[in-house]
């Protein structure tokens, strides 16, 4: 298996092979953690600034990015949408 592009709410995220090298049952959690981290990185913010911007507790985002907690799919899509719209408007 090789790297591939995942598109979520108009944002293209490169998924590297190393993010997929775990068991299938663990893969969904790892991918979700990978996606939220890449979305934050595309916003150009660190965790603290990203949390303040979204109104999220820091520990929640940290747990999502580390795969210690599962976020609802709709939350991932809403965050991706907000980042995409703010970038398009030139505010990020």
Q: How would you describe each model-predicted region?
A:
Residues 35-49, 78:
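Short basic helix-loop element that most often maps to the first helix and adjoining turn
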Residues 70-92:
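DNA major-groove recognition helix of helix-turn-helix/homeodomain DNA-binding modules
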Residues 1-30, 85-92:
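N-terminal flexible/basic segments that precede or flank functional cores
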């Amino acid at each position: 298996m090789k790297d591939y592009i995942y598109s979520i709410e108009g944002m293209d995220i490169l998924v590297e092979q190393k993010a997929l090298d775990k068991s299938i049952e663990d893969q969904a959690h790892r991918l979700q953690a990978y996606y939220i981290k890449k979305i934050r990185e595309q916003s150009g913010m660190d965790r603290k600034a990203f949390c303040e911007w979204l109104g999220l507790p820091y520990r929640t985002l940290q747990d999502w990015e580390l795969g210690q907690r599962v976020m609802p799919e709709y939350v991932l899509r809403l965050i991706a949408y907000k980042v995409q719209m703010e970038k398009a408007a030139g505010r990020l």
